């Protein structure tokens, strides 16, 4: 089953990490609202490296809590990332064992994609 979960970023906050005072890496926390596919919120820890377009990377872990359009309630943790290069490399996975409620037992991939309507997760449940 494929779930398209559209979201918008509500806020992001740069974070300081002790011992990691460098301009080559950035750490942020995000708050997101999911508006379709899953209705709910997510809290995200995001780390990026690189500043030049075509030479950046990121990795993020986020906890999504909400309800699917068919009424299933729960939470699940997703880890995703990518390397902006030619060609780009992107990944995303549901972290095994992190589902609660109706999301318990969820496994599969979860990649961020973009279209004319904005950003969304393409979640492929296995």
Which role fits each region the language model picked out?
Residues 1-126:
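Beta-strand-enriched cores of mature, soluble protein domains
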């Amino acid at each position: 089953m494929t779930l398209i979960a559209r979201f918008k970023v509500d806020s992001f906050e740069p974070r300081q990490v002790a011992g990691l005072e460098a301009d080559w890496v950035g750490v942020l926390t995000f708050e997101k609202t999911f508006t379709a596919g899953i209705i709910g919120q997510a809290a995200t820890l995001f780390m990026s490296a690189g500043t030049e377009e075509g030479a950046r990377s990121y990795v993020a872990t986020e906890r999504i809590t909400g309800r699917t359009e068919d009424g299933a309630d729960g939470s699940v943790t997703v880890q995703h990332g990518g390397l902006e290069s030619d060609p780009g490399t992107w990944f995303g996975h549901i972290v095994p064992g992190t589902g609660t409620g109706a999301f318990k037992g969820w496994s599969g991939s979860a990649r961020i994609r973009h279209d004319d309507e904005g950003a969304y997760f393409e979640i492929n449940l296995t």
